[in-house]
C-alpha cells in the first residue's frame, strides 16, 4: 500500500499546484463534495443554511473551511510518516465531528476531480494513481485511529 519515492514526488509536485491557490482549490473541493454527496453537508452546522450553488459560492465560511480541509497537504508532506499530525485530526473527526470513513472517501474523490479539472495537463495516469494511493493511505490510517478512539465510523 505504501508509495515509492517517485510516487511521493508526483503527489507532492501536484500538491504544490494545489497550494498555489489553496482557497480556490479548497472551495472547489467542498462545492463538489456537497453537490455529489449532499448528505455530507449535515456534518457542517455553519453550512446547513446554504441551499443553492450561488449561496455556496458566496460563502466566506465555506471558503475558509476549504483552506482548512486542504491542510491535508501537511500530512501528505510527511510521506506516510504522519502519526503526529494524524492523531489530533482523527480524534476530532471521530469524537467531536463523527465523520464516517465513507465521507473521507467522498472528499478524496472530490479532491481528485478538482485536481484533474484544474490541472489536467499535469495530472496524468501515473500522477492520478499516486495521489489515489496517498489519499487511500490517509483514509486507512484515519480509520485505524478512529478505532483507537472507539469510533467505528
UniProtKB/Swiss-Prot annotation:
GO biological process: removal of superoxide radicals
Keywords: Cytoplasm, Heme, Iron, Metal-binding, Muscle protein, Oxidoreductase, Oxygen transport, Transport
Binding residue positions for nitrite: 65
Record note on quaternary structure: Monomeric.
Domain Globin: 2-147
Source organism of the structure: Aptenodytes forsteri (Emperor penguin)
Binding, heme b: 93
Its job: Monomeric heme protein which primary function is to store oxygen and facilitate its diffusion within muscle tissues. Reversibly binds oxygen through a pentacoordinated heme iron and enables its timely and efficient release as needed during periods of heightened demand. Depending on the oxidative conditions of tissues and cells, and in addition to its ability to bind oxygen, it also has a nitrite reductase activity whereby it regulates the production of bioactive nitric oxide.
Catalytic activity: Fe(III)-heme b-[protein] + nitric oxide + H2O = Fe(II)-heme b-[protein] + nitrite + 2 H(+); H2O2 + AH2 = A + 2 H2O
Transferase keyword on record: no
Localization, UniProt: Cytoplasm, Sarcoplasm
UniProt xrefs under PANTHER family: MYOGLOBIN
Chain's gene name: MB
GO terms of molecular function: heme binding; metal ion binding; nitrite reductase activity; oxygen binding; oxygen carrier activity; peroxidase activity
Protein name: Myoglobin
Keyword Transport: yes
Binding site for O2: 65
PROSITE patterns the record matches: GLOBIN
Record-stated family: Belongs to the globin family.
